Amino acid sequence: MSKIYNNLSIETLIKTAWFNQFDKNQKYEIMKGIEADLDVSHYSYSKFDWREMEQIRLGLEDNLDVSWYADPKYSWFQMEQVRLGLEDNLNVSIYVEENFNGHQMEQIRLGLVDDLDVLIYAKEEFDCVQMEVIRDGLENNLDVSVYANSEFDWEQMLCINEGLKNNLDISIYANPEIPVEKMKKIKEKLLRKNNSSSKFDFYKNQIIAFFNY
């Protein structure tokens, strides 16, 4: 343990008042960084808790530009979303420079990973669950413009999303003024009607095939 840091050996460093301002977990993160030859000056501040320190340390280990997120205004989870985005060479500016919480950032990052048009839902007006339902629609090539509206809550969005997946006439219930329970009943009624039509068409085709045999 003779390594030197800022002209101090580790043995001397750990005895300083500066080092002892940190709690046990923060000290661990600082020591991990020093042992890995990292520039711990990016995170060796008491304003960062140990989980935030960890995210900055992991970014430094991967040679990432931690200046994107080494800021106490971000929670550790927000920092993680930025770090993971940088690892994947994503355009993290889409979600770093806005007032998104960590879970919103996660949904935007996941959309960027899948090369989706995240600008459709990368808006503060959507919470993370609404974002997830819109992202799911984009992944399934649905016309999300029908429900990418903050006037719909996430359950209403999901009802419309499921209707689109089942080729239902969602125009009947895609209205934010319709309560979600009523939406569900309309959706189920349309599903039953579709299933009945499908069964009828199946048996009709079987009969036609039989007589044409």
Range-by-range predicted roles:
Residues 1-213:
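General marker for long, soluble alpha-helical cores
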